[in-house]
Amino acid sequence: MSMFNKVVKEFQWGQHKVRLETGEVARQASGAVIVDVEDTVVLATVVGAKSAKPGQDFFPLTVDYLEKTYSAGKIPGGFFRREGRPSEHETLTSRLIDRPLRPLFPEGFYNEVQVVIHVLSVNPEIPADIPALIGASAALAVSGLPFNGPVGAARVAYIDNAYVLNPTRDQLKASSLDLVVAGTERAVLMVESEADQLSEEVMLGAVVFGHEQMQIAIDAIHELVRDGGKPEWDWQPAAKNEALIARVTELAQNDLLAAYQLRDKQARSAKLKEVYAATSAKLEEDALAAGTVAADKATVGNVLFDIEAKIVRSQILNGEPRIDGRDTRTVRPIEIRTGVLPRTHGSALFTRGETQALVVATLGTKGDEQIIDALEGEYRERFMLHYNMPPFATGETGRVGSPKRREIGHGRLAKRALVKCLPSADEFGYSIRVVSEITESNGSSSMASVCGGCLALMDAGVPMKAHVAGIAMGLILEGNKFAVLTDILGDEDHLGDMDFKVAGTEQGVTALQMDIKIQGITKEIMQVALAQAKEGRLHILGKMTSAVSGANTQLSEFAPRMITVKINPEKIRDVIGKGGSVIRALTEETGTTIDISDDGVVTIASTSSEGMAEAKKRIEQITAEIEVGQVYEGTVLKLLDFGAIVNLLPGKDGLLHISEIVNERVKDINDYLKEGQQVKVKVIQTDEKGRVRLSAKALLNEAAAAAQSDTPPQQ
């Protein structure tokens, strides 16, 4: 009899066979599930604390997705030969898993929960993110934790005008869409996508298709729970302190209403801080007078937050102006300036209301491309986009340093929005880095990065296929009433039910990201949000086109210029030289950057046209073939008893035999030649070993013969 109570569920999911199993591995975790999709295997585990920490006033959920190099049959690089800090891909996948899980935990559940997913085996054709998300959902479901799941997930491609479920990596290369959708049986919770200017109808269709197809996985998780799940936790939310709620409402409601009549963010924030402080102080006075203990500030803060949310949400649903005085469809005022930094390759300052991005584009060579060492194999990234948001952007102090998960996620979203509108490497051979520095933030800074990024690229002379703009939408949902908000503020994001970001061109959508803070939304709400987002996006595109009609035709004087030279691939080693000596000398002496591809295409880059021309000339000389009958102006390198070694081209020498110097007999070669002397010679013979024989007297004889016949001598 086995010591394991192993439960296995298998199902066919599109073109893939999926296997879920629990009960054998990681049995001391609250829940653990292994997911196997065509040899891509992940172990998802969940551990939940049995009680919340004292004074805990938020839900401490952490999700860690970890790729093990052994899963791809590799040994890690580096001195220690073990996995280090999470890669950008691991961080993004951790966020992808966190986003649909978080809203399904009940309000008031503050116990610490940790979800850890290990990638144990990788089929290069099957991405591990969807199995990881399914595994995390299943592990939570079997754990018995209070979780309103399970969650399903699916990747959707769009190939030849048809949706494809969970495509392979090869299929994704031919797809105009890469969309991940997650949700419950009833509704969609999360969308993350990159598209090639697709219509809103196609995007919505992909979301609906993915939601329909994920039901198979949700059903399988239900079966796994039925046969292998642990007992449900007996957890109940703490009873609400109605007396405290009533007293806080009495003390603060009117002041909070007044605060939300202030249109300026800084003034409103200052007023809210006053209200919070005054309310806490008054409650402490009440407690002192009654001889009781006052409620802690975290509890009071939660009550005040709930009152704020009710005020803002009811005003919007009742048709009243939003926090800053706008209606639900108006975009904040926009200001655009390009070329703001004198020595950068391209720059733009994009301001929308109280959100501002200073975006800089830098052009580089192939050597500047980012090398990604992924489980599926090494590849190069030609386009990089980095997003930074320092604390001063919101008028606060805080840590400055390496990017946080949020910054990495926002940078990836902006990159996805722009990448499909970049020219190909054949059209524009530069590597490109865009950096978005958020200098002010009051909502939708990632979409400001998209707009500013597009403008900075055009300022740098990158021939974009079209202008790209982004906009963030919000949602207020109460029962059957809902309002979709265009261009949300930070407070509206904080107090609302959805963050729905859409980027694209006039032609269509290039990126769509949706996060739901409630337990899902319907197709109708998504339809309204997409239509309203298109209206806002077109408005912003109009402003951008008015400011910058197209890409600059001239690159910045500080940007590198590039030329290419095609050489025989067999000559690559000659250009590189022993230990890189030749190419190193070339780059140092000409002030250029030189990249050589395996097919013999040499790319020379420099801010100096003279340096590029010199490097090109020298490369052509190095790779030139020595041909019999050719005449060269050579340099005497060395004198020997029987002749001289003459350098014809870089790395190409020949022997000028003593008998080939002049027609008369030469007794002492020093009477005719000196080391370093320039001498004109003709190639009279080459052999299979590359040895070259030269003659100077042949040219003398030709000149004499030409003089006799009045024919100009050969030059």
Curated annotation (Swiss-Prot):
Task: Tell me the enzyme class.
Answer: transferase
Which Gene Ontology cellular component terms are annotated? cytosol
Which of UniProt's keywords are assigned here? Cytoplasm, Magnesium, Metal-binding, Nucleotidyltransferase, RNA-binding, Transferase
Subcellular location per the Swiss-Prot or TrEMBL entry:
Cytoplasm
| Residues the record lists as binding Mg(2+) | D493, D499
GO biological process annotations for this chain's record?
Answer: mRNA catabolic process; RNA processing
Q: Where is the KH domain positioned along the sequence?
A: 560-619
The job of this chain, per UniProt, is described as:
Involved in mRNA degradation. Catalyzes the phosphorolysis of single-stranded polyribonucleotides processively in the 3'- to 5'-direction.
The protein here is known as Polyribonucleotide nucleotidyltransferase
- The source organism is Burkholderia orbicola (strain MC0-3)
Q: Which gene carries the instructions for this protein?
A: pnp
